[in-house]
From Swiss-Prot:
Protein name as annotated: EF-hand calcium-binding domain-containing protein 4A
Feature: compositional bias, Basic residues: 1-10
Signal peptide: none
SUPFAM superfamilies, per the entry: EF-hand
Domain annotation EF-hand: ranges: 41-69, 71-106
Annotated binding of Ca(2+), by residue: D84, S86, N88, Y90, E95
UniProt-listed Gene3D superfamilies: EF-hand
Length: 256
């Protein structure tokens, strides 16, 4: 699924809590400098994937790392699937950074893991400025999902579909993929029906055009035949008239 939209902003309270935590934490030891470096690299990779500044990345976005990581497209898909623990089709910055660090074997200290866990909770609770932005983000995700399924023109304006999709995503995520598969099949069927309808209309138009052409040809042939017949009859009348005139002249001459 390709998700479009504006990047959600970090709330002022979140910035203050992060700055306070950084100011009071103990200096990192050489043992945990590598994880910090890894998290920074993960952030850079996330930015490379998130060219549109959506605030999250999809499986397609992750393919942009082919030039950065020695991984094939199939391996990148496998990486995405392993990081997408919630099976919602996208990764947040926290999910990507934490998951990538674990995937590459970076061992965090107990204190660092605890802090990252707190950071993750902070991100979850403070990333958005309010419910309106969350609704906008979900609406954009739904739109992107429908676009990916090829169903945007069919189901985009159906509020019932939108509400059911949102409810499954929040309450029954294990059923969401089945619902999206159903939408994909229905939209594919509707597109096929529309294609057949368009094909039939084009065939009828061609048939009408061919029929009109045949009618015009018949009309032209009929006009030509009428013209020939008219000329033949006129010629016949002229011949008869000329013959009658000659007979009449002979009759007059004989009487004289």
């Amino acid at each position: 699924m390709a998700h479009l939209g504006s990047r959600r902003r970090m709330s002022p309270g979140l910035r203050t809590r992060i700055a306070h935590r950084k100011a009071h934490r103990t200096p990192p030891s050489p043992l945990i400098a590598e994880p910090d470096e890894m998290m920074g690299k993960a952030h850079e990779l996330f930015q490379l994937c998130d060219k549109e500044d959506k605030g999250l990345i999809t499986k397609r976005d992750l393919q942009r790392l082919q030039n950065e990581l020695p991984l094939t497209p199939e391996q990148l898909e496998a990486v995405f699937d392993s990081l997408d623990q919630s099976n919602n089709g996208y990764l947040t910055p926290v999910e990507f950074s934490m998951g990538l660090g674990k995937l590459l074997g970076v061992n965090l200290s107990h204190e660092e893991e605890k802090e990252n866990s707190m950071m993750e909770e902070t991100f979850e609770s403070g990333w958005s400025d309010g419910p309106d932005e969350e609704d906008d983000a979900e609406e954009m995700l739904f739109s992107a999902t429908m676009e990916h399924l090829g169903a945007s023109r069919i189901f985009q304006e159906h509020k019932e579909i939108r509400d059911l999709w949102s409810r499954l995503r929040k309450e029954r995520p294990e059923l969401l993929s089945h619902f999206e598969e159903f939408l994909y099949r229905v939209s594919s069927y509707i597109r096929d029906v529309h294609h057949e309808k368009d094909t039939l209309e084009q065939a009828l138009k061609r048939k009408e055009t061919d029929h009109g052409r045949e009618v015009r040809c018949l009309y032209e042939e009929m006009e030509q035949q009428i013209k020939i017949e008219r000329e033949r009859l006129l010629k016949k009348v002229l011949i008869k008239g000329d013959h009658g005139l000659k007979n009449y002249s002979h009759l007059i001459m004989s009487k004289v």
